[in-house]
Amino acid sequence: GDVYKSQDRDSAKTVAEKREAMRKSLSADTFIAGINAISSDGWLVNIDGTGNRVAAICFGPENVILVAGTNKITGAMQSAIARARNVAAPINAKRFDLPNPCTVSGKCADCISDTTICSQFLETRYCKPAGRIKVILIEEELGF
């Protein structure tokens, strides 16, 4: 049968191993990730600290599979950006135990620091080449 090898940055024992796993994911056959928000007209919004996820969505892997619950669907584009910044980012900062203002307040404070997780913003409206990005939308509340 087929052999699958995953690149799991969370299983890395050192910072160097973590960065290597993130780099290898850029040349993966398939990259799987979540989405921070989806606008009502179909734009995908993602925010990253390091940029490894948004880089892989933009370019690299042959196939990108993005999974989201219907709780990620918002109104217009500004609502999707607001959701990514004020819902997903603070929860993610808390998950990584970062000393950012949003970890305490639950809202984006536009912080600029070495610990910010809002370094890279990606707004995706179209996929080139066609069919490379597949979105799986699940009718339930998933993730943050």
Identify the function of each model-found stretch.
Residues G1-Y4:
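Short, small-residue-biased leader/transition segments that mark boundaries at the very start
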Residues S25-F144:
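Conserved phosphate- and dinucleotide-binding cores of soluble alpha/beta proteins
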